[in-house]
């Protein structure tokens, strides 16, 4: 058996017994040992493979610019990040905007508002649509990231990435969704159009909140690996795969309202399979990233 065929045999075996990521984890550990982390290679890895949960927060912090590439600076930089976090939190407590009883995700929202100069005059003011998006993402992030300082910074930078890097791309995603759904199942798209459901699908939930509150966090984090590392287009393929997975149910519904209501509250037990198939679809239509080196 050649070295390549041995490796392929091992990969297939690992996948069958539930250790699909063994070799990928080793590759990531090699990348993380570099004195200066190669963000391009970390992006490529994250686009190709799911990040092991033990390294996810670290990789996200590097890719979102919370940590610099140089290892020796990490402890000092995180110390500054923590000091800033505690200063902002203290300021909010002084002006009685938050208390120890305030839900953590809402604390993150108020901190973000204060730091971006958008804190309302009173905590009782109704939330803006952008605040609702931040809150949904923060609630999901809480389930993925244990440390509260990490969670705030990752949420903040994740939302900033949506508002800057992806600002022009996100409004194009509904059109791309229809395009790829048509390629995968034209009859399904025709049904949505005949029911006048196509313009009324839960696009805000899918593409503004990035499926926060729609998919369980254990599945969602594999989607967000791709978003953090440079592709918001993965969101399109998750939406397409949701429609393909629940095709029989959707085809049986004959009103836009019923279809939208169902898609806003899809059964959770298929989510892992949906995300895996969505990633395969994304690679099929957009290619698999390869290291430039």
UniProtKB/Swiss-Prot annotation:
The keyword Ubl conjugation does not apply. Keywords: Cytoplasm, Cytoplasmic vesicle, GTPase activation, Lysosome, Membrane. InterPro entries: Rab-GAP-TBC_dom, Rab-GAP_TBC_sf, TBC1D7, TBC1D7_dom2. Its main location: membrane. It comes from the Eukaryota. The keyword Lyase does not apply. GO terms for molecular function: GTPase activator activity; small GTPase binding; TSC1-TSC2 complex binding. GO terms for biological process: activation of GTPase activity; cellular response to starvation; negative regulation of cilium assembly; negative regulation of TOR signaling; negative regulation of TORC1 signaling; positive regulation of GTPase activity; positive regulation of protein ubiquitination; response to growth factor. GO terms for cellular component: ciliary basal body; cytoplasmic vesicle; cytosol; lysosomal membrane; TSC1-TSC2 complex. It holds the Pfam family RabGAP-TBC. Changing residue 114 to A: Abolished interaction with TSC1. Highly expressed in heart, and slightly in kidney, liver and placenta. Residues 50-231 form the Rab-GAP TBC domain. It is found in: Lysosome membrane; Cytoplasmic vesicle; Cytoplasm, Cytosol. PANTHER family: TBC1 DOMAIN FAMILY MEMBER 7. It is linked to Macrocephaly/megalencephaly syndrome, autosomal recessive: An autosomal recessive disorder characterized by abnormal enlargement of the cerebral hemispheres, intellectual disability, large head, optic atrophy and underdeveloped skeletal musculature. Head enlargement may be evident at birth or the head may become abnormally large in the early years of life. Additional clinical features include behavioral abnormalities, psychosis, learning difficulties, prognathism, myopia and astigmatism. Component of the TSC-TBC complex (also named Rhebulator complex), composed of 2 molecules of TSC1, 2 molecules of TSC2 and 1 molecule of TBC1D7. Interacts with TSC1 (via C-terminal half of the coiled-coil domain). This is TBC1 domain family member 7. The gene is TBC1D7.
